[in-house]
Amino acid sequence: MRYFFSLLTSLFLIVPISSGDLASSLDQNLNGVMTKVTDWRHYFHEFPELSNREFKTQKSIAEALVEMGLEPNTTYGKTGVTAFIRGQNPGPLIALRADIDGLPVTEKLNLPFSSKERTVYQGNDVGIMHACGHDAHIATLLGVASFLSQNTDKLNGDILLIFQPAEEGAPEGEEGGAELMLKEGIFDAEKPDAIFGMHVSNAKHGQLWTRPGPMMASAEAFRITIEGKQTHGSRPWNGVDPIV
């Protein structure tokens, strides 16, 4: 998956790691890593969960990290997961973040790993789908974690993995997402020198898009109320036309 390589490429650029040694190790273990990433992506795509309800997703991520010899922390953001990869050489602390929630969208593709999950959302029976690529984000970060956890001797500094829930927005009346994780003190003990995330895109294989500052802003919904003032047609100046 090209996003796995994009995130690893970013690491080679931003962290003073022994990139040559890591690249050589990746070449030697490429097929095994890619098989894992593909399997994870299919699994999480088949079993998506909505914001603040990512219970099975959280459990599966934590179990995968344990198998890598890491110690997952599930105390932040209700259904979030964090874990450290400690390099054997001094260097910065870099955080890598992936979002994990799905959307109330019914999948229409008939694939072996298509989502068949359903729920009641705002009074309607709807499907649940990873329609925004978060399944690929989870799989990519797990792939990077799997690779780096086996190469800590070549890693200068530490990596903080952040699997963030509720990126699409917490349910009405609930807290969630990155804001809640920060409120709960995710960086109180150790503050990263930098944080990097990524999103699936239409970039060609081998390309990495980035820019300083905000990137890929989301579209938000809002509701407004316009109040008019009734008047007679012969005296429009006494009224307020809400349409105009």
Where are each of the predicted segments found?
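Positively charged n-region of N-terminal signal peptides that target proteins for export
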Residues: 1-4
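General alpha-helical segment detector with a strong preference for membrane-spanning helices
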Residues: 6, 103-105, 137-139, 203, ...
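Bacterial N-terminal signal peptides
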Residues: 6-16
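Acidic/His- and Gly-rich active-site-bordering loop/insert found
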Residues: 22-130, 139-143, 147-160
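Histidine/acidic-residue-rich, glycine-tolerant segments that coordinate divalent metal ions
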Residues: 118-129, 135-136, 153-244
